[in-house]
Every structure is written in structure tokens, then in C-alpha cells.
Amino acid sequence: MDEQDRKTALRMIPYGLYVMTAEAKGSAPAAATVNWVTQTSFVPPLLAIGVKTDSGVYAATKASGHFVLNILGKGQQGAAFTFFKPAELEDGKLSGEEITWANNGAPILKSAPAAVECQVVEIVEKGDHHTFIAEVTGVHINKHPEGRPDEAVLEMKELGEKVFYGG
């Protein structure tokens, strides 16, 4: 298989951008920008999220068994870039972002249009990113979208011509 063709083809898959947050008992909250996300079931409502195994949010989610998927909206490129690096909790803010706490104990970004609380039901431990299969246990709408909900989501391509993840 041609390496460049593989990258090109896989980069044609569109992705939204999300900040996944989790907090394991006795640890600081962790957060990371993620984009390999999809809904996989209506009943029960399930999501699948690919997460890099050496990330803090991976460790916190695996230890706690739950997380929040904060859905970034149009214009939130700054938040996406912020959580490309490890998060820090300072003065009640997570890497400068105001937060509140979900019922499952993970942080919710107040600036995110929506956040989804999830309970991990399975971890597929294959590849350099493991896949969390998780049931949606709660939702928080901070800003109702005008028009189609899927058009309100920040997409990878909106981070610039040279920003890719995948391939």
C-alpha cells in the first residue's frame, strides 16, 4: 500500500473536535482534544472514542470508568489547541477554561455548546489508540444550536490547512 495514498484517503474522513475530560479518584483532572468519535447505538446510546494510550485522559478514564465529551462549537479553535497539551487545574479553571462538574465527577467546559457524560462499558485495546465504548448517561446543553446540530460543531479542517490527525 502506498503510504501517502493511505494518509490521503484516511484524511478524507471528516471529524468534529471535542475535549474529553476525566478525573480519577485522588488525581487532578485530565483533558485532551479528541476527534475520533462516533455514535454507535441508539439503544442504549453508545459512543466510540479513540484515545491515545499515553495520554493523561486515557489513564484517568481507564481508572475512573467515566468521562465527559465536551463538544466544541464553531469559533472554538483556541480551546481545541489548548487541550493538545496536558491540562492544568488552576484557580478553578482547567487550562484557563471555566468549568463546572458533571454528575460523574468529570469537568464540563462552560464554553462548550454541549457536553455528554459517559460511562465506559468496554475498552478495545488494539493499536496506538484504544477505543472506549461508552454509554451516554447524561447531557448538558450550554448553547442550543441554530439550524442543524451537526453544523454547529468545530471540525478539524477549521484548524488550518496544515493541521491533520489521522492517516
Language-model segments: which ranges?
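Basic, polyanion-binding surface patches
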Residues: 1-167
